[in-house]
Amino acid sequence: MNELTYLQTMPKQTALLKTHCADFVVKEQLGYEMSGDGEFVAVKVRKTDCNTLFVAEKLAHFAGIPAKNMGYAGLKDRKAITEQWFCLQMPGQPTPDFNQFQLDGVEILEVTRHNRKIRTGSLDGNHFEILLREAQENADLKVRLENIKKNGFPNYFTEQRFGRDGHNLTQALRWAKGEINVKDRKKRSFYLSAARSEIFNLIVSARIRQGLHHKILVNDILQLSGSHSWFHADQKEDFNLLQQRLAQQDIQITAPLIGENVQIASDVENEIIAKHQELLYLMHQEKMKSARRPILMQAQHLSWSFIPEGLKLTFYLPAGSYATALVRELVNINE
């Protein structure tokens, strides 16, 4: 990610992230309450240094059901303390006694029932509590924090999306060139996600570099904030009014997650995608649906304090946005 453009400038400080699991706390918010009855057993878990898939498998084994009958809203960081819901499909069966469930690093917080499966993506967002160790209080860092609070940060996909050392992206490029054949369903999904995340990042970086991240262009596709509704900024629109709405954070400029029937909105998008036709072809071949994503993201309820250990941050992000993309604007990280 080093080559991606910063919204501010490259940070001047270096800090430590995830020295301890307690330095990175994530609390999931589904956006709905459990129904209290139904064929699914819903289990809220606090995990410390645990992989989501590993915990899901252990819960399924304890309940005596296949792992495929487990559901969760999303994968969480391993080296962290995370809270999230799992659901187990158990129609007509009693709720297991999870007081008997034992797994290092896992604490059962709540058990109830629900009438629908918790699916990947059925997530409103996440609350974060992050400690950046060795970050020093100074004028530059305070300005960066205030700028993020006011203007947001680039909504980049970060390293987690691309796998260790960018492995998922490398494999996607090899797949697109016909060098490998990927049969494993999970790997196919990871590689496709990495490929279109890379295109998105490059488009966002180019707009910021060209000073176009706060300027609405003809044919831009805009998103109503807090929704998944989009509309074109065609020549009939009042661009002065659109710019006012953008400044008021009522609307957001988007960039594409390439796929079938992708709508290329601006010259910036066209230029980047034209250089990666093999990836676009792969998306069509795999029938990936195209989507849009805001190029900038606003951290909600952002607050901070300097303590002897470093800088402590708390904020909320909608599903799909990365806390490490925000941190990237503040400090260089040594993990």
Curated annotation (Swiss-Prot):
Pfam families: TruD (PF01142). It is an enzyme of class 5 (isomerase). It catalyses: uridine(13) in tRNA = pseudouridine(13) in tRNA. GO terms for biological process: tRNA pseudouridine synthesis. Responsible for synthesis of pseudouridine from uracil-13 in transfer RNAs. This is tRNA pseudouridine synthase D. Keywords: Isomerase, tRNA processing. HAMAP family: TruD. The gene is truD. CDD domains: PseudoU_synth_EcTruD. Residues 152-308 form the TRUD domain. The active site is at residue 77. Transmembrane segments: none annotated. Belongs to the pseudouridine synthase TruD family. NCBIfam families: PRK00984.1-4, tRNA_TruD_broad. GO terms for cellular component: cytosol. One of its GO terms (molecular function) is RNA binding. PROSITE patterns: TRUD, UPF0024. Its EC number is 5.4.99.27.
